[in-house]
Amino acid sequence: HLPTRRQRQMCIRDRDFAFYLNFNKKLQSMTPEKFINNVLGNLNIHYLTIGDDFKFGNRRKGDYEMLENWGSLNDVTVQQTPTYLRGDRRYSSSWIREALDKDDFELAAQLLGRRYTFSGKVVSGNSLGRTIGVPTANLWLPKSNLPIKGVYAVKVHYEKEILLGIANMGIRPTIGGENPVLEVHIFDFDKNLYGKRIEVEFCNKIREEKKFSNLEELKSQIHKDIELSKNLLIS
């Protein structure tokens, strides 16, 4: 089962399987030698490709030379891929996060080769959106949260459908929220999504999150945001 865009893209070109390691304390503390023997050695590898700055194992002590030596003894071809540059700067996840933090979605999309997305499972919330006529799907967030904040026009990928909507990524200050939450309102949609996985594609930033004096003010602004989102997504 490959639920996320990154995982699906890993299998686009003639790849039958994709294995993902759970990066926990055990894996983090594993020596390079143990990683080679316990992980790579059990996968029947014939060809291995890594980035030219790739390090692995505890304290990043493992490198290309170590893998190449292991490969020569075990009939495994090990190849380094070159660094890809945009101008004089290296493509990197930190550069993408920096672009997103600055709301430069155009640059982020150019670096990613697509728009920024987040895939997650819909979890139960406090149902506030439903009480003000704007039901939302709340997504479970990783501990690291997301490198964005504010209100966005979005496309929601659910099963084989692409749905239009609006999302808020933030702490919901109007109701005294403290923890970051990603809430998504899907236009003209009333299916139960609890427990389902959806993918949110962030298309345009509408505004920053702000604290309103009361729920009526919040509701009024949300409806304005919805109209703006529809215009941006349909145009």
Task: List where the protein language model places each region.
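Single conserved hydrophobic/aromatic residue that forms the stacking wall/gate
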Residues: H1-R8, I12
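Contiguous mid-protein beta-loop-alpha structural module that forms a pocket-lining wall or clamp
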Residues: K26-A109
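Residue-level signal for inorganic ion chemistry
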Residues: Q9, L48, A108, V154, ...
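Phosphate/ribose-recognition catalytic cores of enzymes acting on nucleotide-derived substrates
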Residues: G125-S235
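Short, structured coil segments at secondary-structure junctions
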Residues: R13-D14, N74
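Glycine-rich, Lys/Arg-enriched anion-binding loops that position phosphate/diphosphate groups
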Residues: G71-G170
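Short, well-structured secondary-structure segments
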Residues: D16-N22
